[in-house]
């Protein structure tokens, strides 16, 4: 049963008013809030606000005032509704039996203040009028007795709570009867409505929070729009196209119309399309297809190139002899003239029955000697030799010089049988004093005469000057030796081989004769005749590798012949020497790298960075492999140095002093390995930097303290090294000198050599130590005596700790050395300086 509560006290804020029950003729105050069955009180403005939100009329927020619990209701006078149906939802008719409705507006003081400030709120007035009208209608309607009839609430007909009919109101005569308990469905419906209203309110609050962020974004976008507009106007003013287009954009740029009112204005329109819609192939696929086409073209070009090379080789079958033949063609040109020496170029080897032809059609005497071998050749090597031979003449004013270039092929066994074919016919040359061989006379008499005259030298001023130079010359010393061939009753073959020509290429001059040519052999073995002079390339600046060497101009060969005047005499070797059989093979990579470096040294901009790096790496690896090993051969090093000098003097300087990643040069490695023959070859080049420091801060002179001197040649080599460099140089690490290092390692021979080169014995390192202190500390008595024998040796020097050499010896327990120092200090005897260096080898020989 719904219980109607009548309170006689007036509603707060409206004093003097009584309840509607006390004044039946007076209209009751309009209700302004409603209490829910579970203790909450809802404001009518809030309900109206929720209803407006559902209908989408407004987004304004209406403040919601939450009422305290039922126990905290004010006790003052007020107007109470007589039914729980007031201002409740029409769909929840059962809720009117479970709660009280407090409808006085004076309960919320803020509303009174609001009315006082801004007057009457129209929305509140409409709500109140609506509620008052409904109350009047319900009061005028006939009321039925019973507990189920309740006075309808004014708020039950609001637009926000509709949908379900009202239950019969409670009669007014019921008084304070007990209200009917609300049903569960009514409560659930109210809860759902409240939850929905709260959810909508939360969503609206979140949207309100986003308003400042959106306003900031809007301002940023407006600023960007303004900047883009300004930029667009400036670009249009300057005549530049606006913006950048992507790769797939199709843009039509139409020229602007002139300032003519009769012509319509046009504008540029950009249309976005896709590449596949336009039929344009994909960029990556197009590149792949293009690469495939280029690869196909490259393969075809390579095939054509190979075919052309094959045809070129087929068109020149006579450039070299067939594989199963053995041919040697010698071309000799003799020129008479007092001023310069002209040398004929060599012809290539031809077929066995082919006549040899000279490269120069004038003044050439040709001698062709072709032999055929019965057995098959396994290996053949092409060799080129250039020899300079002075020729006898009737007049002493003119000198005839012939340059003989021999191209030979030999088998690996060296025992091929060779027959005597008839010599090739040749026309006698007016400039040649030697008759050519006649075709009808195959006897070797003419050949013997020519060979004898060619190999018999005549003493000249150049040869005398070379003999006077002796071993001081840097020229190539080539040995002339004879190859012994097993005796054969039919043919006797003799080979004269020159070793050391053209940077290490062996050269041979073969003469085939019968057993009757004893006169030719005896002529070559005569004692009064001096040995044959050989062409040198030690100082020749025009030397090139084997391929370009054949067929050079006469001017280049003339320069080579002029440089050959410095060559000393050749020595006749009684037998084969393993050192003479060493061959120098210059790889094509090394040759090309040397030529590239030569270009770079002449013009630093001639090579790219990659080409320079490749050339530098190749030369460095080949040179270090050749000269920096412990078993490096001095002859190979010398021949490479000759080749580098022939290419360029700058190239020689660059290669000799090239260093690895640790700063070590070939001289550093050679001295460390005690390979003094290679050290001498490097020093003889004249471009070796003997004072160059490595990354550790040591020079080659300092590294001699680690080497062991075995022979007198080793001592002479280090003496040459010391004289070329600075023996007083200090290491960058501790400031030690070569003398200090030699004393510390106990190298007596090196100490003697340094003293012979007038080294400063009083130099101090970073700690203030001298060589004498080092000898005293390590207990080297002999070295101490050598140092004390130097008159300039100062034994009173102190180190950083204030210790003298005597104190160092006493601290080390070297009593004998301390006695020597004490005697030197007291007696002050002076020893004679070392005027001459005496080597251990010579001293042992005297004993």
Curated annotation (Swiss-Prot):
SUPFAM superfamilies (alphabetical): Ankyrin repeat
Highest taxon, organism lineage: Eukaryota
Region (Interaction with AIFM1): 1-72
Post-translational modification: Phosphorylated by casein kinase II upon estrogen stimulation. Phosphorylation induces the release by KANK2 of NCOA1 and its translocation to the nucleus where NCOA1 can activate gene transcription.
Residue runs in coiled coils: 187-207, 284-311
Tissue expression notes: Expressed by podocytes in kidney glomeruli (at protein level).
GO CC, one annotated term: cytoplasm
Residues found modified as Phosphoserine: 19, 83, 86, 89, 92, 358, 536
Record-linked Pfam families: Ank, Ank_2, KN_motif
Modified residues (Phosphothreonine): 170, 331
GO biological process, one term: negative regulation of transcription by RNA polymerase II
Keyword match Mitochondrion: yes
Keyword Mitochondrion: yes
Location of region: Interaction with NCOA1: 665-831
Region Disordered, residue ranges: 1-32, 161-182, 414-473, 502-581
Keyword terms: ANK repeat, Apoptosis, Coiled coil, Cytoplasm, Methylation, Mitochondrion, Phosphoprotein, Repeat, Transcription, Transcription regulation
Modified residues (Omega-N-methylarginine): 105
Subcellular location: Cytoplasm; Mitochondrion
Chief location of this protein within or outside the cell: cytoplasm
Record function comment: Involved in transcription regulation by sequestering in the cytoplasm nuclear receptor coactivators such as NCOA1, NCOA2 and NCOA3. Involved in regulation of caspase-independent apoptosis by sequestering the proapoptotic factor AIFM1 in mitochondria. Pro-apoptotic stimuli can induce its proteasomal degradation allowing the translocation of AIFM1 to the nucleus to induce apoptosis. Involved in the negative control of vitamin D receptor signaling pathway. Involved in actin stress fibers formation through its interaction with ARHGDIA and the regulation of the Rho signaling pathway.
PANTHER family in the record: KN MOTIF AND ANKYRIN REPEAT DOMAIN-CONTAINING (PTHR24168), KN MOTIF AND ANKYRIN REPEAT DOMAIN-CONTAINING PROTEIN 2 (PTHR24168:SF0)
Description of how the protein assembles with itself and partners: Interacts (non-phosphorylated form) with NCOA1; NCOA2 AND NCOA3. Interacts with AIFM1. Interacts with ARHGDIA; the interaction is direct and may regulate the interaction of ARHGDIA with RHOA, RAC1 and CDC42. Interacts (via ANK repeats 1-5) with KIF21A.
Protein name, entry field: KN motif and ankyrin repeat domain-containing protein 2
Species of the source: Rattus norvegicus (Rat)
